[in-house]
Amino acid sequence: MSYSQQVNKRRTFAIISHPDAGKTTITEKVLLYGNAIQKAGSVKGKGSQAHAKSDWMEMEKQRGISITTSVMQFPYHDCLVNLLDTPGHEDFSEDTYRTLTAVDSCLMVIDSAKGVEERTIKLMEVTRLRDTPILTFMNKLDRDIRDPMELLDEVESVLKIRCAPITWPIGCGKLFKGVYHLYKDETYLYQSGQGHTIQDVRIIKGLNNVDLDRAVGEDLARQLRDELELVKGASNEFDHDLFIRGELTPVFFGTALGNFGVDHFLDGLTQWAPAPQARQADCRLVESAEEKLTGFVFKIQANMDPKHRDRVAFMRIVSGKYEKGMKLKQVRLGKEVVLSDALTFMAGDRSHAEEAYAGDIIGLHNHGTIQIGDTFTQGEDLKFTGIPNFAPELFRRIRLKDPLKQKQLLKGLVQLSEEGAVQVFRPLTNNDLIVGAVGVLQFDVVVSRLKSEYNVEAVYETVNVAAARWVECSEAKKLEEFKRKNEQNLALDGGDSLTYIAPTMVNLNLTQERYPDIQFFKTREH
């Protein structure tokens, strides 16, 4: 197979949803269809049952939430699909945000009983920054749901994206009978209790087929025909160009738990979603068709293998082909590295990659030299842009139960901050360690991982910090004066960047007014 054929058969996507909309269940079922697992695990991991394959960190298993982004690759039809699983819990915006910079399309999962929820709105704002194409799955049809037309209207008005229904539900809850495919003129009948394995679904051709009335009952069949009249008149036709521009989303209905409808959106994904796209670097646009390898690191994860103290950097390949043993330039450090043991993923199971192409995600072993945002090339000096770091909104001081373990604590915190799990600030005037996060759950994650991975017991104390801003100034003299006068409020972050730590928002505003030549940044490029 030629290089361009290899690239064109790849689809790299992420699933976005509000917590509890059924994302982990969908991930499981997608893997089931991709033959990546034989039987879907029970998602919340109750006692002896199988844990969901994509939730493999200790704390995730206990809480039933996906905390870190795993990567799973599987074949489907003629395509090779890379699924990046994003944390579903509302606390995890940074990791999720960066993951969305590494995909070419997204599947939005909506709980049909609840409609569009707050977390979905936030994630959609992120996908808007790059006009990522979106497919939509209306989930939980085996429960009582809101009116399907109402759901489409809500998506259109709240998320500002046009909807084109591809399938349409027949009943819901206990009366859920299946879906009708608007473009194939076929009805797929639902059987309950078949969630763990793939079933043969009965298909009825034609909307006016009498078999349809027999299968779903005359009332539901009549209701379906009436609704479809309305749908065809009131909703948008699917338009591929609008979809690629992120202006229109194809909508599928089903139930992930009942394993029904999942294959319909997978068909849509492989048929319509874009193959790996070009990406902007600081000096030029890099096309996926280029044969020289380029890629960027969007995430670092510690200890994917509890047996080894390792860290893995996740790299999205933008162009070219990875081959075992090849030499690459790590642009930030200006040094050559030999990649002999990159990994491919099936969540938690790792296998060594012999080759990988544009669109694929590979794992690089990292002994502290790779950071989020690093670019790797075959010699060219370029840096991919658009991988952000956010100023945290919540702060705690972290204190050791055993003061002799200061060194391990610092090492653990710096590693966790490079991974993007949390941010660490070391004030210039004392030995405190201040931890900053975007959401409360991150604090729990850090303490639990310090204990299980670094054998360090730590506790939090409140700290008088309301905001952190990265500071820069083009004139060294003015920066020195600023440092001298504000030393009490300055710290270094995990990457040794100078940060202003404000006790109150009023203080921050006053300081910004007092020093107009100093720039205060809320986000910064990695």
Swiss-Prot record:
Binding annotation for GTP: 17-24, 85-89, 139-142
Gene Ontology MF term list: GTP binding; GTPase activity; guanosine tetraphosphate binding; translation release factor activity, codon nonspecific; translation release factor activity, codon specific
Chain ranges of the tr-type G domain: 8-277
Single GO biological process annotation from the record: regulation of translational termination
Keyword GTP-binding: yes
Gene: prfC
Organism in which the protein naturally occurs: Histophilus somni (strain 129Pt) (Haemophilus somnus)
Function recorded in the entry: Increases the formation of ribosomal termination complexes and stimulates activities of RF-1 and RF-2. It binds guanine nucleotides and has strong preference for UGA stop codons. It may interact directly with the ribosome. The stimulation of RF-1 and RF-2 is significantly reduced by GTP and GDP, but not by GMP.
Record Pfam families: EF-G_D2, GTP_EFTU, RF3_C
Subcellular location: Cytoplasm
GO cellular component labels: cytosol
Protein name: Peptide chain release factor 3
Superkingdom, natural source: Bacteria
CDD domains: RF3, RF3_II, RF3_III
Stored SUPFAM superfamilies: EF-G C-terminal domain-like, P-loop containing nucleoside triphosphate hydrolases, Translation proteins
Main location (coarse class): cytoplasm
